Amino acid sequence: MAAELSEDGETFEIIDLFGGQADLQNKVIRCVGDPHTRLTEDALRVLRGVRFAVKLGFDIHPATRAALKDCGHGLKRISRERISVEFQKILCSPAPLRGVSLLTDLGLMPHVLPCGTSPYGTGDLHHLPNDFAVRCACLMWQMPECDLLENIRGLKLPGVVSHAIVTLAK
């Protein structure tokens, strides 16, 4: 979308070449142009698509959803710190359980948490305080310690946050 100012400089007209306004009204996340191309240009967009969907309560367009699934392997080229930041935002969103479900359904969870999540605490995410360490610990509750520690190392978190997650998850 772009805005074109009128000659008087007071008003403007929105020029929507890609249907962005309709997508906003319909609450749909969609890539501009070919989704595979957009997600290959910057693989972090894969996680951002999930984050925006859960933060805004939007659906993901089927073609974009398919591309998110197909392009997840590109996350191997993204720094663990950047992946961790997106994961923190997903878990601290208004719909953390939906975020975890999307990450799992799209095959993205192994790129975020290499050892996966615990089968025990996932359903309780929406009842927990909006605190990353608490929600992350819930995802890893009662995991084998070696898996828990590998997940934590992979997230590249500050020591105090890592320690809190490990303590809570045991």
Put a short name on every predicted segment:
Residues M1-T64, D70:
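Acidic, glycine- and histidine-enriched catalytic cores of nucleic acid- and nucleotide-handling enzymes
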Residues K76-K170:
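Conserved, hydrophobic alpha-helical core segments of structured domains
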